[in-house]
């Protein structure tokens, strides 16, 4: 086995669930609609490996990584959880230990497309960064600069 992972249920938001085509009328379960889970839209912090690249993780490593995801449970609604995970994905895509608010603002168009009813995307980005800071996921370095904390970057 090369890779084996789990994703905590609180990372499942409507945006990652892709509806499949319904079964044909001649199928035993005609009309049944399944789904695919698009794990590419789940932040790396939400992917908890038991086995990674053929190397088995220790129980303590797995439990520690799992406990670091608890902050996602704090999001009250599915919509706020979606925003939180979307902003976290943007931060991970920057791929730098330290990043600026302007770096995250670079994803404004992407976030606007995902959340078309929100006309204050920059304010929402700042709000989510504050939440991530308060939950210990990122550190505020100063003057619009942040540092990723959990994934060892």
Model regions and ranges:
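A short acidic, leucine-rich amphipathic alpha-helix
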Residues: 103-105
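Positively charged, polyanion-binding regions of nucleic-acid-associated proteins
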Residues: 78-98, 130
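Charged low-complexity interaction tracts in eukaryotic proteins
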Residues: 123-153
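Eukaryotic modular interaction domains in large regulatory/scaffold proteins
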Residues: 98-100, 110-111
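Basic, glycine-/proline-tolerant helical and adjacent loop/strand elements
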Residues: 1-3
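Glycine- and acidic
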Residues: 88, 110-112, 151-153
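Long, low-complexity, charged/polar intrinsically disordered regions in eukaryotic proteins
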Residues: 5-86
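Short, positively charged loop/turn segments that connect secondary-structure elements
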Residues: 109-125
């Amino acid at each position: 086995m090369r890779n084996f992972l789990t994703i905590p249920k609180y990372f499942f938001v409507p945006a990652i669930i892709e509806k499949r085509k319904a079964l044909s009328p001649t199928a035993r379960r005609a009309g049944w609609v399944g789904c695919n889970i698009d794990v590419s839209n789940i932040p790396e912090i939400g992917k908890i490996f038991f086995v990674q690249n053929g190397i088995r993780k220790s129980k303590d490593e797995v439990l520690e990584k799992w406990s670091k995801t608890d902050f996602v449970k704090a999001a009250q609604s599915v919509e706020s959880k979606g925003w939180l995970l979307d902003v976290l994905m943007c931060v991970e895509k920057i791929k730098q230990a330290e990043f600026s608010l302007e770096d995250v603002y670079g994803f404004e168009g992407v976030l606007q497309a995902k959340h078309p009813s929100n006309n204050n995307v920059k304010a929402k980005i700042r709000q989510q960064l504050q939440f991530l800071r308060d939950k210990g996921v990122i550190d505020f370095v100063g003057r619009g600069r942040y540092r990723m904390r959990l994934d060892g970057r």
